[in-house]
Amino acid sequence: MSTVLCCVLVLLISVALCMDFEERPSSSWRSEQTMFLKSHKSRNLLSLRDLQQPDHGKMKRSEESAQNQCESLHGYQSTLQNDTHTHNFNDLSGSVSLAWVGDGTGVLLVLTTFQVPLFIMRFGQSKLYRSEDYGKTFQDITDLINNTFIQTEFGIAIGPDNSGKVILTGDLAEGKVTKIFRSVDFGKSFVTSELPFHPLMQITYNPKDSNILMVYSINYDLWLSKDFGANWKKIHESVCLVKWGIDDTIFLTTNPNGSCSDRGTLELRKSLDYGKTFKTIGNRIYSFGLGGRFVFASIMTDSGSTRMIHVSVDQGETWDMAQLPTVGHEQFYSILAANNDMVFMHVDEPGDSGIGTIYISDDRGIVFSKSLERHLYTTTGGDTDFTNITSLRGVYITSVLAEDGSVQTVITFNQGGEWRPLMKPWNGVCDSTAKHPSECSLHIHASYSISMKLNVPMQPLSETNAVGLVLAHGSVGGAVSVLSPDVYVSDDGGYTWFQALKGPHHYAILDSGGLLVAVEHNPTHPISQIKFSTDEGQCWHAHNFTDDPIYFTGLASEPGARSMNVSLWGYRDTILNQYWVSVTVDFRQLLSRDCQENDYIQWLAHSSDINSPTDGCVLGYKERFLRLRRDSVCWNGRDYKVTKEPTTCPCTLTDFHDFGFYHEENSSVCVEQPDLIGHSLEFCLHGRKEQLQTSGYRKIPGDHCEEGITPERKEIDLSKKCVSNLLRTEQLTKEHSFNSAPIIAVVIIVLLISAVAGVIFIKKYVCGGRFLVHRYSVLQQHAEANGIDGLDDLDTLEGGKTHYHDDSDEDLLE
């Protein structure tokens, strides 16, 4: 009877998840199970039928070895058994926080906390543990922080690079002063300091100097320390948002009336001398964001109901209007990714549609091309699947929303120039709900699926030093499935995929891709096995790490994918209590042999047609890498560096974006947009109106092609002033003076009338976007929660987050 009830319960939960995920009022269960974008196709989005061409069907590394049987790896069980280390944390902690200190040091700090609210008070305790051997053994060092309860919301603040600096913030009790605990020796010892304020956020380090710290107070005052927290000085009041810029620059927004809720009336200021002096560089600010060498400001227009983006490439000294659509109160801008060459910007559509358009900037951040329409980006939770595949340049994955509400994964291999569905895994079985065999593809689960509470424990994973490797949860069919996903692996940067593991798993990349590890995700049942692969996920082996299974909660390995140690965290549930358990497995003795020169082979990235002279050319050049042979069981080592050989390619039309034009399907030729025929493309540059003469092509930022095809492009100075909303009106009228008072009066009146008329005309018709279709978008909220700097963040506190949704490539503005 209990079995029947369980089955019924599982079925009901599955149906509920389907309805919750799709947000559609009615449809059959079968159609809700998977979804596919069919009815609407972006101009830059290739269909699956387009990919059935010979140049896209080349057999890849994973498929070439598919016929090889997995050979048994002898003797590994006894080897790993001797290198498996278990530690029990015998306290009543309800949560655990982990932080790696330094690179290659093996130092791991673990903070356990236990809290019990009692009426208007709360009781809590913290314990601090330290490991010097990658988590194999731990020492209780709680006495070093005087048994103080640590505020877990501030986390463990680790200094940049290999500074060895650590800061813990104590809990404020009974109105007393706040204490911080500082370490300069990787947590071996701590010094206690009292703060002259109560912090509102985690203390942040200067990225280039770990002795310089900055933090908000609960009164929105900005405090700075130059001696690693020993002494503090208040450098500004009424601070709404603050960020570290390049070259020790501090950017902040403030409101003279002290209210940060009046968005659109803020001032943007910067300091080059750690707060001794501040310079106002913008007014009417809603918010601002940083990305690469760009500074973006979201400002209110004269109407007070819309916002637009201004951009600066000289740290706010001069500003230009970004050619992006304006947005209203209910919309937002979001920087998805940025570097010194370009920016991906998401512009939200009006209404609560959950979609928008991705635009790509030029190298000045001013002119934008439309990259992808119907990009899925929910406004409520700020969830987007936009992911930078760091193991291969130019590759990004995200999701689009079809008009019927279905979700589909798309990928670009040339930095947003063209998007396409993912290829069906060569060993994958297409879901029966696919309407046509040609519509069967792989769909990746990322942030959106996690936010919808699907059974997805991890987002896609890639590492810069594990060339071509990508691990992700996904499903094969017509669209994203709400059923439990499987783990898929790509060894060529996302061109081809194969199913590596059945069901959801936690996974990690070790030894620069020479070793993959995974643990089954099953919150309701204890586990005792860890799986590992030495051939990029083709074959997997199981190691029983314990005879007493644990309820598994997470996998931890040192950042950078160079370690050979991985820790499984979980808890054991006894009759009397629960306690945390850490199991660390050292795989170094498994890969006992150092890799030699003959263990590596040459691999051409982005290869699709070996007979083409441009095979592998992406963004103007091709790269050949030395990669570990699939059948080589050896140790890359911590000092392993990616070996690559770049070769410049001649320019082709694929090295250019459309501007005022669009690609015809199955063609790289730009065709002029019907609504732009007969119109000039105009934009504002450094306060003057420019006219862009182009045959429809704009070179992709960061493209290094030489010679070959070079479409004509010319900018003409129209000698007409563009007035930036970022400057005060009185600042723009102090430019001319004459000797005669009457002439001055007449000229000033004429100039004022002309200026006002010109401003209205240019803002409305030129820079506002009547003629300009490909424009850049405003940045969205929650930018910092995802890592990149955002413009229109609703939450103005950084909270100690790092940069980008690239591993951090995401920025939001509004």
UniProtKB/Swiss-Prot annotation:
Membrane topology, Extracellular segments: 19-741
Annotated glycosylation sites: N82, N146, N257, N388, N544, N565, N666
Motif (Endocytosis signal): 771-776
GO BP term, example: Golgi to endosome transport
CDD domains: Sialidase_non-viral
Cell location: Golgi apparatus, Golgi stack membrane; Endosome membrane; Endoplasmic reticulum membrane; Nucleus membrane
InterPro entries referenced in this protein's UniProt entry, alphabetically: Sortilin_C, Sortilin_N, VPS10, VPS10-sortilin, WD40/YVTN_repeat-like_dom_sf
UniProt KW NADP keyword: no
BNR repeats: 129-140, 181-192, 223-234, 269-280, 310-321, 359-370, 410-421, 488-499, 531-542
SMART domains assigned: VPS10
Regions crossing the membrane: 742-762
GO cellular component, one term: Golgi apparatus
Record's comment on post-translational modification: Palmitoylated. Undergoes cysteine S-palmitoylation which promotes the partitioning of the receptor into an endosomal membrane subdomain where it can interact with the retromer cargo-selective complex which mediates its retrograde trafficking to the Golgi apparatus.
Ranges of the Cytoplasmic topological domain: 763-814
Disulfide bonds: C70-C539, C240-C260, C430-C440, C595-C634, C617-C649, C651-C705, C684-C722
Lipid modification (S-palmitoyl cysteine), residues: C767
Bilayer disposition of the protein: Single-pass type I membrane protein
Chief localisation class: Golgi
Keywords: Cell membrane, Disulfide bond, Endoplasmic reticulum, Endosome, Glycoprotein, Golgi apparatus, Lipoprotein, Lysosome, Membrane, Nucleus, Palmitate, Receptor, Repeat, Signal, Transmembrane, Transmembrane helix, Transport
Summary of subunit composition and partner proteins: Interacts with the cytosolic adapter proteins GGA1 and GGA2. Interacts with the heterotrimeric retromer cargo-selective complex (CSC), also described as vacuolar protein sorting subcomplex (VPS), formed by VPS26 (VPS26A or VPS26B), VPS29 and VPS35; which is involved in retrograde trafficking of the receptor from endosomes to the Golgi apparatus.
Protein family membership: Belongs to the VPS10-related sortilin family. SORT1 subfamily.
Protein name as it appears in the record: Sortilin
Organism: Danio rerio (Zebrafish)
